[in-house]
Swiss-Prot record:
Gene name as annotated: trmFO
Protein name from the UniProt record: Methylenetetrahydrofolate--tRNA-(uracil-5-)-methyltransferase TrmFO
Keywords tagged on the record: Cytoplasm, FAD, Flavoprotein, Methyltransferase, NAD, NADP, Transferase, tRNA processing
InterPro entries membership: FAD/NAD-bd_sf (IPR036188), MnmG-rel (IPR002218), MnmG-rel_CS (IPR020595), MnmG_N (IPR040131), TrmFO (IPR004417)
Molecular function as annotated in GO: flavin adenine dinucleotide binding; tRNA (uracil(54)-C5)-methyltransferase activity, 5,10-methylenetetrahydrofolate-dependent
Taxonomic placement: Bacteria, Bacillati, Bacillota, Bacilli, Lactobacillales
Names of the cofactor(s): FAD
Biological processes annotated in GO: tRNA methylation; tRNA wobble uridine modification
Coiled coil start-end: none
Residues that span the membrane, as ranges: none
EC number: 2.1.1.74
Pfam families for this protein: GIDA
């Protein structure tokens, strides 16, 4: 295949990472991004790698699978992780970022790379004669989505994804919250709004009866479990939220707390957490409260949360339809297309779920696109690593039951020998092996 550059379509997390990895290997890149010419309902800016849901890249410890994935990506020179570290905001044991500062930094690093040419245009056809990484995301334009679905004989998959509301910090009643991270991990980074049992029962009643924004009548309500609307969770049972985003465990009242509580209990019945959303600390999001309620209903119901009685919503929660591919049938473990070998796919459209996972897929696709360009052998990362196990999972899962997947220790190859019963010790050993295997892989 004779060509002088590689195409990357889409400048989200995956596309930005792929373009950067290719350029860092000395190959010119044409990076196409339609925003600036054609917008989407979910994006608010024209910047690259815009975070449209949460501002959290989740746990940072190596005993957390996504923490391991991030460490692997750091060692691979990820532009997404470098930008995230530079724009991080307090979030206890998690890596959260100033969402605007983060996307601005990614944009600057990519746009200013001497080997990356940014083209603001919509692509409606899949190239057939140029090595191309397609990373158009779950919000791929209709015209291009049709071409991608055609690779799968016209059968496309979808699920619904949702974002949580964002609050002006000056409208939060600070007398009703306390600063703490769960189990006191890391710095005290979350504002915690405790609820008594009666407050929770009243809130649950209002939530399950609130009016949702309509979906298209011909589409079933299919949600990704990791980003489920809070009202859907509430309808699964009155205690479901107490084991999810409103879990009180590890968030005991501080000694100086004087607000309402149930008797002498040291832990609230339920807790709503608010997390800093920007570096200035002027915005907070409601953790785990992705929603598809009508905006007026969001205001009515969420103002029942103690401290948010007079909250001003800078952004209401929204939901959007995400499309993804039948990756077990369509992709190699390098994210290369089985049917059209000049194409690589990356990002959430491949069935990886999450910001970090999307960027990781772009990293692998970019590396392999560069290797194909140079006529080098493909790079299949070990399935003992988080980044390799993710690629292995989406390309080896049962196609009939394939659904988007976050990275987790369950998809990483088990340790050899007798099973370590202590979970933390087992995860530490898996992480230790993963990083050792990655280093060995990179030296071959």
């Amino acid at each position: 295949m004779s060509q002088s550059y590689i195409n990357v379509i889409g400048a989200g997390l995956a596309g930005s990472e792929a373009a950067y990895q290719i350029a860092e290997r000395g190959i010119p890149v044409k990076l196409y991004e339609m925003r600036g010419v054609k917008s989407t309902p979910q994006h608010k800016t024209d910047n690259f790698a815009e975070l449209v849901c949460s501002n959290s890249l989740r746990g940072d410890a190596l005993t957390n699978a996504v923490g391991l994935l991030k460490e692997e990506m750091r060692r691979l020179g990820s532009v997404i992780l470098e930008s995230a570290e530079a724009t991080r905001v307090p979030a206890g044991g998690a890596l959260a970022v100033d969402r605007d500062g983060f996307s601005q930094m990614v944009t600057e690093k990519v746009v200013n790379h001497p080997l990356i040419e940014v083209v603001r245009d919509e692509i409606t056809e899949l190239p057939t004669d140029v090595i191309t990484v397609v990373a158009t995301g779950p919000l791929t334009s209709d015209a291009l989505a049709e071409k991608i679905h055609a690779l799968n004989d016209g059968d496309g998959f979808y699920f619904y994804d949702a974002a949580a509301p964002i609050i002006d910090v000056n409208t939060i009643d600070m007398s009703k919250v306390y600063l703490k991270s769960r189990y006191d991990k890391g710095e005290a980074a979350y504002l915690n709004a405790p609820m008594t049992k009666q407050e929770f029962m009243d809130f649950h009643e209002a939530l399950v009866n609130a009016e949702e924004a309509p979906l298209n009548s011909f589409e079933k309500e299919k949600y990704f479990e990791g980003c489920m609307p809070i009202e859907v969770m509430a309808k699964r049972g009155i205690k479901t939220m107490l084991y999810g985003p409103m879990k009180p465990v590890g968030l005991e009242y501080p000694d100086d707390y004087t607000g309402p509580r149930d008797g002498e209990f040291k832990t609230p019945y339920a807790v709503v957490q608010l997390r800093q959303d920007n570096a200035a600390g002027s915005l907070y999001n409601i953790v785990g409260f992705q929603t598809h309620l009508k905006w007026g209903e969001q205001k009515r119901v969420f103002q029942m949360i103690p401290s948010l009685e007079n909250a001003e919503f800078v952004r209401y929660g929204v939901m959007h339809r995400n499309s993804y591919m039948d990756s077990p049938n369509l992709l190699e473990q390098t994210y290369r297309s089985k049917k059209q070998p000049n194409l690589f796919f990356a990002g959430q459209m491949t069935g990886v779920e999450g910001y970090v996972e999307s960027a990781a897929s772009g990293l692998v696709a970019g590396i392999n696109a560069a290797r194909l360009f140079k006529e080098e052998s493909e790079a299949i990362f070990p399935d003992t690593t988080a980044i390799g196990s993710l690629a292995h999972y989406i390309t080896h899962a049962d196609s009939k039951h394939f659904q988007p997947m976050n990275v987790n220790f369950g998809i990483i190859k088990e340790l050899e020998g007798e099973r370590i019963r202590d979970k933390k010790a087992r995860y530490e050993k898996i992480a230790e092996r993963a990083l050792a295997d990655l280093e060995e892989f990179l030296t071959v």
